[in-house]
C-alpha cells in the first residue's frame, strides 16, 4: 500500500455478504476428532512463529484441550526475525538478545560504546529493529495517533477477501482487508480469530528501549470465534504492516498450538492388537554355583511388560485379596471367574470428598487415551454437572460447579464416570462450557463368585440345577468398600483398604490394555472394532484355558481359590478335586454299582441285552403254565363240539309209563 492522501481510509470497510459467507464456512468446519476424555490434561504450548515457521515466542501450560486461551505477548521485532531486510534482523537467531548498543541515556548510565543518538529528534526514516535507537523509533510509530500498525488475516479469511493478496503483500493488498491493529481508524472484524494491540504504553516502552531490550511488546487475544476453532494445531497466519508515510513495511507471523502429549504414536506394519500374547512369566530359581561370589554392584533390570496371562491373573489375585480380607468365610474354597463377554467392569456409585486444585494435578495428565464407557453403574453417589433425568437415580447428592477454572480430583480408589468417558479428574471449565455430567464411582472388574459344588456339578454332569444359580459379582460383594468401609467401621477396615491397592493396580493395567486394544482396532478397522473388541477378552481367556491356567465354565474362565490364595494351575486343581470327589463317591457304593463303574463297555453291553434277556426269562418261566392252560381250554371246546354233533344225529325215544298204559285200558 503506497502512502497517498486518498488511499488510506480512517475506518474499516465492511462487506455486506461477510456474515452469510462466515456462516457457510463455519458450517463446513469439522472439529479435530480426538478420542480423549475432554477432562484430560495435556501439556499445551501456544507458539508464535515468524515467516520461516520458526518459533520466536511461546507460552506453556497444563490444561484440557480448547479451554486455555492465554494472552500472547511476543515482541514486534521478534516476528521480523529472518524477515525482509528493512527490519535489520536477517541474521538474528530466535530467543537471542536484541542487537545494537544501549542508549547512553538509559538506566544503566553511560557505558562504553553506547549510542548517543537516542536524544536526537526522531527522523522520518523507516523504523528498524537492529539498534536500540531504531527500536525506540519503532515504539514511537506504533503508539503515534496518526500512525500505528494494522493486521490482515491469511488463508483462513472468507472467499470475498481474495483481493487481499498473498504473502507477497502480507495479505494486505487492498484496503478493507485489515481486521485488527492499532491505527487511527480502529480496524476491527466480527469473524477473525484474534485481536492485536500494544502491550506497553509509550511511556513504559521508552526506558525499556533505551536499555537495549525488546521493547515493542504486542498483546494478541483470541476472539470468541477463535476460541471455537479447533484447527490451531496446523496453525493460522496473518500479515502485519506499519502505517507510515511512504511504503508500509510488513511481516508475516503465525500462531499454532503444540500438544506434546497427544497420545500413542501410530504404528507402521501389522496390526499390533494381539502382539502381547506372551506366556506367563515363571519364577526362576538362581543357578547353583560352587564358585565364590564376587561383589558386584546391584542392578535391577526393568520388569518386562506383563503378558495377557499375568495381567488377568493379577486381576484375579487382586480380587481374591480384597475378598479374603473382607469376607474370609467366602474364601474357604471358591472359584473366581472372569467373564469372556462385555461388560468387563461395573461401577458402584459412592459418596466421597474430592479435592480442589487450582493447577492440574499429576494424575490429570495420565487419563485414558480413549473414551471408555462404563455400561453398568449401580448404587447412589455423588454427581457433578447437569445430570439428566434418566440418570438422576444414581445421584444421592448433586453438586453444581461454580465459576472459575479449577480441577476436581477423585479420591483414591475411585474415578469419575462421565458421559464422555472415565477420567481421574474433572475440569470445571469443561463442565461449565458443556452439558457434561459425572458420577463418582468405584471401579470393579466383573469377576463372578461360584461355590465349589456348583462348579463340580457342572463338570461331573451328574445332576442339573432346576434354575441357574445367582452369580455373585465382586461389585455386589465389595461395593462401597473404598469410600464406605472405614465410615461403616468394619473390622477389617484399614487392612482391607490396603488390600484393594493391588486390585486397583491390576484394574489400571487391564484398563490400559483394553484402551490400547480399542485404539489399535479403531486405527486398523474402524467399522469392525466394536465387533472384534467383544472377542478380545475371549481370545485372552482362550490362551489361559489352553495353557491349563483356568477352567472353562460356560462363558467364564474360572480360577480355584482357598485360604492359600489363587491356584495358578486351575485345571490341574480341578482334575484333582474331581478325582477326590470320584473316589469319595465310589467308596460309598456297593459291589454291584462298582461293577458298572469299573468298565464303560460292560455298562453299554448290559444295557443293550438286558431287554431281550428279561423277555426270554419270562417266556421260560411262564411258558409251560400258559401252554397247559391253553391245551386244557382247547380240549374243553372240542368236547362241547362233539356233544353237539351227536345230538344232531340221534333222537331220544319217548318213555312210556306202564301204569299209565294200564289206566288207559
Curated annotation (Swiss-Prot):
Q: Which residues lie on this side of the membrane: Cytoplasmic?
A: 627-665
Name the residue ranges of motif: CX6CC. 550-558
For this protein, what post-translational modification is recorded in UniProt? Answer: Specific enzymatic cleavages in vivo yield mature proteins. Envelope glycoproteins are synthesized as an inactive precursor that is N-glycosylated and processed likely by host cell furin or by a furin-like protease in the Golgi to yield the mature SU and TM proteins. The cleavage site between SU and TM requires the minimal sequence [KR]-X-[KR]-R. The R-peptide is released from the C-terminus of the cytoplasmic tail of the TM protein upon particle formation as a result of proteolytic cleavage by the viral protease. Cleavage of this peptide is required for TM to become fusogenic.
Signal peptide (from-to) = 1-31
Cellular component GO terms, alphabetical: host cell plasma membrane; membrane; viral envelope; virion membrane
Residues assigned to the Extracellular compartment are 32-605
Residue(s) at site: Cleavage? 467-468, 644-645
What keywords are annotated for this sequence in UniProt? Answer: Cleavage on pair of basic residues, Coiled coil, Disulfide bond, Fusion of virus membrane with host cell membrane, Fusion of virus membrane with host membrane, Glycoprotein, Host cell membrane, Host membrane, Host-virus interaction, Lipoprotein, Membrane, Metal-binding, Palmitate, Signal, Transmembrane, Transmembrane helix, Viral attachment to host cell, Viral envelope protein, Viral penetration into host cytoplasm, Virion, Virus entry into host cell, Zinc
User: Which residues are the lipid attachment points (S-palmitoyl cysteine)?
Assistant: 625
Start and end residues of each stretch annotated as Immunosuppression: 533-549
| GO molecular-function terms, A-Z | metal ion binding
Q: List the disulfide bonds.
A: 77-129, 103-118, 104-114, 152-172, 164-177, 209-215, 334-337, 334-558, 364-418, 383-395, 425-438, 550-557
Q: Which InterPro entries does this one have?
A: FMuLV_rcpt-bd, TLV/ENV_coat_polyprotein
| Receptor-binding domain (RBD): annotated segments | 32-267
Offer one Pfam family short name for this entry: TLV_coat
Q: Where is this motif: CXXC?
A: 334-337
Q: Which residues cross the membrane?
A: 606-626
Binding positions (Zn(2+)):
117
The GO biological-process annotations, alphabetized, read as: fusion of virus membrane with host plasma membrane; symbiont entry into host cell; virion attachment to host cell
Which intervals of the chain are annotated as region Disordered?
A: 266-307
**Quick one: where's region Fusion peptide?**
470-490
List of glycosylated residues: 43, 199, 211, 324, 356, 363, 396, 400, 432
Motif YXXL motif: where in chain: 650-653
The record describes the protein's role as: The surface protein (SU) attaches the virus to the host cell by binding to its receptor. This interaction triggers the refolding of the transmembrane protein (TM) and is thought to activate its fusogenic potential by unmasking its fusion peptide. Fusion occurs at the host cell plasma membrane. The transmembrane protein (TM) acts as a class I viral fusion protein. Under the current model, the protein has at least 3 conformational states: pre-fusion native state, pre-hairpin intermediate state, and post-fusion hairpin state. During viral and target cell membrane fusion, the coiled coil regions (heptad repeats) assume a trimer-of-hairpins structure, positioning the fusion peptide in close proximity to the C-terminal region of the ectodomain. The formation of this structure appears to drive apposition and subsequent fusion of viral and target cell membranes.
Let me see what the UniProt entry remarks about domains. Answer: The YXXL motif is involved in determining the exact site of viral release at the surface of infected mononuclear cells and promotes endocytosis. The 17 amino acids long immunosuppressive region is present in many retroviral envelope proteins. Synthetic peptides derived from this relatively conserved sequence inhibit immune function in vitro and in vivo.
Q: What is this protein called?
A: Envelope glycoprotein
The gene that this protein is the product of is env
Amino acid at each position: 500500500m503506497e502512502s497517498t492522501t486518498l488511499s488510506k481510509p480512517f475506518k474499516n470497510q465492511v462487506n455486506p455478504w461477510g456474515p452469510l459467507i462466515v456462516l457457510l464456512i463455519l458450517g463446513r468446519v469439522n472439529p479435530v476428532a480426538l478420542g480423549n476424555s475432554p477432562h484430560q490434561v495435556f501439556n499445551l504450548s501456544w507458539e508464535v512463529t515468524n515467516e520461516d515457521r520458526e518459533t520466536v515466542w511461546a507460552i506453556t501450560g497444563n490444561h484440557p484441550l480448547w479451554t486455555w486461551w492465554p494472552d500472547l505477548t511476543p515482541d514486534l521485532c521478534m516476528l521480523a526475525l529472518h524477515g525482509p531486510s528493512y527490519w535489520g534482523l536477517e541474521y538474528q537467531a530466535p530467543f537471542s538478545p536484541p542487537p545494537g548498543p544501549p542508549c547512553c541515556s538509559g538506566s544503566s548510565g553511560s557505558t562504553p560504546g553506547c549510542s548517543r543518538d537516542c536524544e536526537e529528534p526522531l527522523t522520518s526514516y523507516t523504523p528498524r529493529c537492529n539498534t536500540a535507537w531504531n527500536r525506540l523509533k519503532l515504539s514511537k510509530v506504533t503508539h503515534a495517533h496518526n500512525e500505528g500498525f494494522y493486521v490482515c488475516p491469511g488463508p483462513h479469511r472468507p472467499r470475498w477477501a481474495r483481493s487481499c493478496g498473498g504473502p507477497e503483500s502480507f495479505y494486505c493488498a487492498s484496503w478493507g482487508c485489515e481486521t485488527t491493529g492499532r491505527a487511527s481508524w480502529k480496524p476491527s472484524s466480527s469473524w477473525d480469530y484474534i485481536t492485536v494491540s500494544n502491550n506497553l504504553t509509550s511511556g513504559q516502552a521508552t526506558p525499556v528501549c533505551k536499555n537495549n531490550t525488546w521493547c515493542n511488546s504486542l498483546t494478541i487475544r483470541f476472539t470468541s470465534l477463535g476460541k471455537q476453532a479447533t484447527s490451531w494445531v496446523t496453525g493460522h497466519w496473518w500479515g502485519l504492516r506499519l502505517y507510515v508515510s511512504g511504503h508500509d513495511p510488513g511481516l508475516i507471523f503465525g500462531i499454532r498450538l503444540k500438544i506434546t502429549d497427544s497420545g500413542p504414536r501410530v504404528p507402521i506394519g501389522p496390526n499390533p492388537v494381539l502382539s502381547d500374547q506372551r506366556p506367563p512369566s515363571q519364577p526362576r530359581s538362581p543357578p547353583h554355583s560352587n564358585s565364590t561370589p564376587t561383589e558386584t554392584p546391584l542392578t535391577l533390570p526393568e520388569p518386562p511388560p506383563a503378558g495377557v496371562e499375568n495381567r488377568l491373573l493379577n486381576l484375579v489375585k487382586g480380587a481374591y485379596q480384597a475378598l479374603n480380607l473382607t469376607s474370609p468365610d467366602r474364601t474357604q474354597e471358591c472359584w473366581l471367574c472372569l467373564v469372556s463377554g462385555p461388560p468387563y467392569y461395573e461401577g458402584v456409585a459412592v459418596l466421597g470428598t474430592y479435592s480442589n486444585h487450582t493447577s492440574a494435578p499429576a494424575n490429570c495428565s495420565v487419563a485414558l487415551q480413549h473414551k471408555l464407557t462404563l455400561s453398568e453403574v449401580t448404587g447412589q453417589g455423588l454427581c457433578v454437572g447437569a445430570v439428566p433425568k434418566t440418570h438422576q437415580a444414581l445421584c444421592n447428592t448433586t453438586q453444581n460447579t461454580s465459576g472459575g477454572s479449577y480441577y476436581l480430583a477423585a479420591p483414591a480408589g475411585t474415578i469419575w464416570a462421565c458421559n464422555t468417558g472415565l477420567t481421574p479428574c474433572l475440569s470445571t471449565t469443561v463442565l461449565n462450557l458443556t452439558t457434561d455430567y459425572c458420577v463418582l464411582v468405584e471401579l470393579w472388574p466383573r469377576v463372578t463368585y461360584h461355590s465349589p459344588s456348583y462348579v463340580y456339578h457342572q463338570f461331573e454332569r451328574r445332576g442339573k440345577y432346576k434354575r441357574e444359580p445367582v452369580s455373585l459379582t465382586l461389585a455386589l460383594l465389595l461395593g462401597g468398600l473404598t469410600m464406605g468401609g472405614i465410615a461403616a467401621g468394619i473390622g477389617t477396615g484399614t487392612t482391607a483398604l490396603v488390600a484393594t491397592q493391588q486390585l486397583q493396580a491390576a484394574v489400571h493395567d487391564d484398563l490400559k490394555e483394553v484402551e490400547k486394544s480399542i485404539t489399535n482396532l479403531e486405527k486398523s478397522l474402524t467399522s469392525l472394532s466394536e465387533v472384534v473388541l467383544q472377542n478380545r477378552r475371549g481370545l485372552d481367556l482362550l490362551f489361559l484355558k489352553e495353557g491349563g491356567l483356568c477352567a472353562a465354565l460356560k462363558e467364564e474362565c474360572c480360577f480355584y481359590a482357598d485360604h492359600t490364595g489363587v491356584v495358578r494351575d486351575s485345571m490341574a486343581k480341578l482334575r484333582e478335586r474331581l478325582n477326590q470327589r470320584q473316589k469319595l463317591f465310589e467308596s460309598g457304593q456297593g459291589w454291584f454299582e462298582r461293577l458298572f463303574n469299573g468298565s464303560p463297555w460292560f455298562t453299554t453291553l448290559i444295557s443293550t441285552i438286558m431287554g431281550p434277556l428279561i423277555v426270554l426269562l419270562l417266556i421260560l418261566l411262564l411258558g409251560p403254565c400258559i401252554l397247559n392252560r391253553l391245551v386244557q381250554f382247547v380240549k374243553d371246546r372240542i368236547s362241547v363240539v362233539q356233544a353237539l354233533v351227536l345230538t344232531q344225529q340221534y333222537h331220544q325215544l319217548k318213555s312210556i309209563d306202564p301204569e299209565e298204559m294200564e289206566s288207559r285200558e
